[in-house]
């Protein structure tokens, strides 16, 4: 005998379970401003929010923005990150405004690391809500990423 399933359950197809996880991608909601913090950099005048998550064999964590001589290691276009020791540079992220026809009318994102820890960089356009992620697997040295098609202008 086949088990009886109410019509609502069959028609739902368990989408009610999956939808809360998919909703941020289907309906990200209105864009929100970038808010600078220990684990958040705001580049190009706050247009782009940058965050880093790291992973090791024994755990996970959030990258922190470095400081050099008490000054935050963040300019308008770039930021340096540490994972474990505030004096040990792990990686850098740069976002450039290439919004001219000769350069393709795009914002560019560059990611480079000096670690074999796994990491994921998340860059969010606070004007549109668009998100790009760049990842490096645990145990591998990262190749520099140069994404010259990252976000549309303006």
For the regions a language model picked out, list residue spans one by one.
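Phosphate/pyrophosphate-recognition segments in soluble nucleotide-handling domains
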Residues: 20-30
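Class I (Rossmann-like) S-adenosyl-L-methionine-dependent methyltransferase catalytic domain
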Residues: 4-5, 9-22
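Polar/charged low-complexity regulatory segments
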Residues: 28-154
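C-terminal substrate-binding/active-site "lid" region of AdoMet-derived donor-dependent transferases
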Residues: 1
